[in-house]
Amino acid sequence: MVKFKAIRGVAFDLDGTLVDSAPGLARAIDMALAHQGLPAAGEALVSTWIGNGADVLVERALHWAGREHNAQLVAQTRELFDHYYAKTVEQGSQLFPQVKATLAQLAANGLPIGLITNKPTPFVAPLLTSLGISDYFSVIIGGDDVVVKKPHPAPLYLLLGKLGLHAREMLFVGDSRNDIMAAQAAGCPCIGLTYGYNYGEAIATSHPDCVLAHFADLLPAIGLPSLKDQEV
């Protein structure tokens, strides 16, 4: 694609893009709610709250549970969430299909790979290690590494500086409107994935430069051989 001809690096969102993390997040939120005598929300609902970081996830859960939340209640629930999520983050997460093989091909072609996630930073490295993909990333930016998270472009600016790339040279791949808005604000070309967590909205409504249904389709989209072609 012409839009991607200048690409010299690729960066990814984490939850809903590389990793199906909804089961672990839902278990942690439900246990935090139960600890306070509140009902469980369940994975289907929690998956629509993912993408803006842990504080917003907690706020959405409390709002759903009918609790008028203040800073103290949010902080208390966030502490409970962190406690439980530390126990569920690894076993409650799995890679989406063909993620590892696709990352391997990007790395084999000499492209630096970055990660930008709103997930609290302490959870990121252990999760990547448990999934066997940590070594593919040149730079990892978690939710605590910047003052403002996606959809603000600040995390992308930080990554561009660390990789020494111009905005037009870095492709950003994500599954939610926050990812697309951040990329567009930073001036980076972007791809939206249809299978992730986007608040029940079609990713195409955010107008990414390209929409893909399968992670491995990224390779031919940027001019590299597909995984299927490499098997021949």
Swiss-Prot record:
GO molecular function: metal ion binding; phosphoglycolate phosphatase activity
Cofactor: Mg(2+); chloride
EC category name: hydrolase
Family matches, as InterPro entries: HAD-like_hydrolase_sf, HAD-like_sf, HAD-SF_hydro_IA, HAD_2, HAD_sf, PGP-like_dom2, PGPase_prok
Gene3D superfamilies registered for this protein in UniProt: HAD superfamily/HAD-like (3.40.50.1000), Putative phosphatase, domain 2 (1.10.150.240)
Keyword Metal-binding: yes
Chain segments annotated as transmembrane: none
CDD domains, per database record: HAD_PGPase
Coiled-coil residues: none
Residues the record marks as active site: D13
Pfam family, one: HAD_2
Biological pathway: Organic acid metabolism; glycolate biosynthesis; glycolate from 2-phosphoglycolate: step 1/1
Catalytic activities: 2-phosphoglycolate + H2O = glycolate + phosphate
Gene Ontology CC annotation, any one: cytosol
GO biological processes: carbohydrate metabolic process; DNA repair; glycolate biosynthetic process
UniProt-listed Enzyme Commission number(s): 3.1.3.18
Binding, Mg(2+): D13, D15, D175
Keyword annotations from UniProtKB, A to Z: Carbohydrate metabolism, Chloride, Hydrolase, Magnesium, Metal-binding
Annotated HAMAP family: GPH_hydrolase_bact (MF_00495)
Subunit structure: Monomer.
Family of this protein: Belongs to the HAD-like hydrolase superfamily. CbbY/CbbZ/Gph/YieH family.
Record NCBIfam families: HAD-SF-IA-v1 (TIGR01549), HAD-SF-IA-v3 (TIGR01509), PGP_bact (TIGR01449), PRK13222.1-2 (NF009695), PRK13222.1-4 (NF009697)
Role summary: Specifically catalyzes the dephosphorylation of 2-phosphoglycolate. Is involved in the dissimilation of the intracellular 2-phosphoglycolate formed during the DNA repair of 3'-phosphoglycolate ends, a major class of DNA lesions induced by oxidative stress.
UniProt-recorded name of the protein: Phosphoglycolate phosphatase
Gene giving rise to this polypeptide: gph
